[in-house]
């Protein structure tokens, strides 16, 4: 696993521990300066008073994670082998060399947003399993779940193997989620919880089948979105829809 210490990575790792899907090792990316997107800060936001466990189909079952628990604490408690990398750039030659030297063929990727994996990293032969915060191929790009809320009154998450094109690799699993009971906590809690749910289900399917099964081998079409304007984000947060009763 390649992970930055964000709320997303904290949700992932706690979910993997809870479901006994431990990574063989975790390489931790240090925090860069002035390069964080929503959901990628130090994850100090408080979680909701109660997890929405009664949502339909238990879709928000991973929302009860603790966003204030640092990765190092979760790693130590679970006894997972971990090492902090010296560089924050996933495409740095030293980072690429270290990843290439690992025996693992697949890495769960939970780094900082806004960075595409370069051709040198992809040429190592490793596969990078990423969970995109959006329903593919319809919603590609950044902060897509706010656009999804405005367009469909739903959130999405899709697991895929990364390629050189943004959010365009083959999709293993994708799910839609009802609006969370507290839309103000999307960045630090519910976006991460939706992705964690899809990640866990993707890995559970692999554990059962012994291979990677794809929901969408040709991830084409859809729209690519850019970081949402604060006014539109505010509207998405404050506009309750038909699905908001699950809290």
What are these regions (language model features)?
Residues 1-247:
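One-carbon transfer enzymes
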């Amino acid at each position: 696993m390649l992970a930055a210490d964000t709320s997303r990575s904290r949700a992932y790792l706690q979910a993997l521990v809870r479901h006994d899907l431990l990574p063989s090792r975790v390489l931790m990316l240090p925090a860069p300066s002035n390069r964080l997107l929503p959901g990628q800060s130090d994850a100090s936001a408080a979680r909701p008073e109660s997890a929405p466990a009664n949502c339909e189909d238990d879709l928000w079952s991973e929302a009860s994670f603790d966003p204030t628990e640092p990765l190092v604490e979760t790693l130590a408690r679970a006894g997972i082998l971990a090492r902090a990398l010296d560089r924050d750039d996933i495409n740095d030659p030293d980072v690429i060399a270290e990843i290439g030297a690992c025996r693992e063929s697949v890495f769960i990727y939970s780094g900082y947003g806004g960075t595409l994996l370069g051709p040198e990293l992809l040429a190592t032969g490793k596969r990078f399993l990423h969970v995109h915060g959006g329903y593919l191929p319809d919603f590609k790009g950044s902060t897509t779940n706010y656009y999804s809320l405005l367009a469909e009154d739903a959130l999405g998450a899709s697991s895929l193997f990364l390629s050189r094109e943004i959010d365009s690799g083959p999709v293993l699993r994708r799910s839609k989620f009802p609006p969370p009971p507290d839309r103000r906590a999307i960045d630090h809690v519910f976006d991460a919880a939706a992705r964690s749910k899809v990640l866990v289900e993707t890995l559970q399917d692999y554990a059962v089948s012994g291979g990677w099964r794809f929901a969408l081998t040709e991830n084409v079409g859809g729209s690519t979105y850019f970081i949402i304007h604060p006014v539109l984000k505010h509207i998405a947060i404050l506009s309750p829809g038909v699905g908001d009763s699950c809290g």
